[in-house]
């Protein structure tokens, strides 16, 4: 299985002066924890890291002792553009691909493997967690419009897995129609293509804020070598 890791995030919401993936948590950088799970996943054979040129040296220094093939890919100005560039850099024989946020450093290796198994059958699937809070839809004035049933709501996560040809087609359609989305599954939704859910649990968070770092520190401390 081929894996693309989106690693172009800034540290603005974290209040950091560097890419948040280079911040330390429980003794390793955020990216190192993400890569640890990817390296341990039995199904992952090739990894591409999509990042900004300014981060290439510090990120590549982390890869010195990689146990799997890892390729650096220059990213774009948005996540969507970065994934497009990542897809263009895939080996010609890539049939399926997983897209993963580098900031989801609590992902477990078995999540990569389970999603890989589903994608290998030609299906599209995303990691997700069922919503436990009551969600409110509000109008422009902040007044509640409705409360969708929690049983219908899932918080999208990564990895997200797709057949390469279908994902490339979806991104091509996005370019031609001017679609801007925050995850790849949204493109499939717009095209009416089916995407399944894999329950990865609530711990597979994306480290975005200082509070997320506290949670990650607590959970990852139990996994230290």
From Swiss-Prot:
The keyword Transcription regulation does not apply. It comes from the Bacteria. GO terms for biological process: isopentenyl diphosphate biosynthetic process, methylerythritol 4-phosphate pathway. Disulfide bonds: none annotated. It catalyses: 2-C-methyl-D-erythritol 4-phosphate + CTP + H(+) = 4-CDP-2-C-methyl-D-erythritol + diphosphate. It is an enzyme of class 2 (transferase). Belongs to the IspD/TarI cytidylyltransferase family. IspD subfamily. PANTHER family: 2-C-METHYL-D-ERYTHRITOL 4-PHOSPHATE CYTIDYLYLTRANSFERASE, CHLOROPLASTIC. Catalyzes the formation of 4-diphosphocytidyl-2-C-methyl-D-erythritol from CTP and 2-C-methyl-D-erythritol 4-phosphate (MEP). This is 2-C-methyl-D-erythritol 4-phosphate cytidylyltransferase. The gene is ispD.
């Amino acid at each position: 299985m081929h894996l693309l890791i989106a690693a172009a995030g800034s540290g603005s919401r974290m209040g950091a002066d560097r890419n948040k993936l280079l911040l330390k948590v429980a003794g390793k950088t955020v990216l190192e924890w993400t890569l640890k799970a990817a390296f341990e996943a039995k199904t992952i054979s090739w990894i591409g890291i999509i990042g900004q040129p300014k981060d290439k040296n510090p990120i590549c220094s982390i890869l010195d002792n990689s146990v799997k093939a890892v390729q650096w890919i220059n990213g774009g100005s948005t996540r969507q553009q970065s994934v497009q560039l990542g897809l263009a850099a895939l080996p010609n024989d890539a049939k399926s691909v997983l897209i993963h946020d580098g900031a989801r450093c609590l992902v477990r290796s078995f999540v990569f493997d389970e999603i890989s198994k589903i994608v290998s059958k030609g299906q599209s699937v995303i990691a997700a967690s069922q919503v436990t809070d009551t969600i409110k839809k509000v109008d422009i004035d902040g007044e509640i419009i409705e409360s969708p049933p929690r049983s219908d709501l899932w918080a999208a996560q990564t990895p997200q897995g797709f057949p390469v040809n279908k994902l490339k087609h979806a991104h091509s359609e996005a370019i031609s129609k001017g679609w801007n989305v925050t995850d790849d599954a949204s493109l499939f939704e717009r095209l009416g293509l089916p995407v399944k859910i894999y329950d990865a649990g609530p711990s597979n968070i994306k480290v975005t804020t200082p509070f997320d770092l506290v949670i990650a520190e607590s959970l990852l401390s139990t996994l230290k070598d």
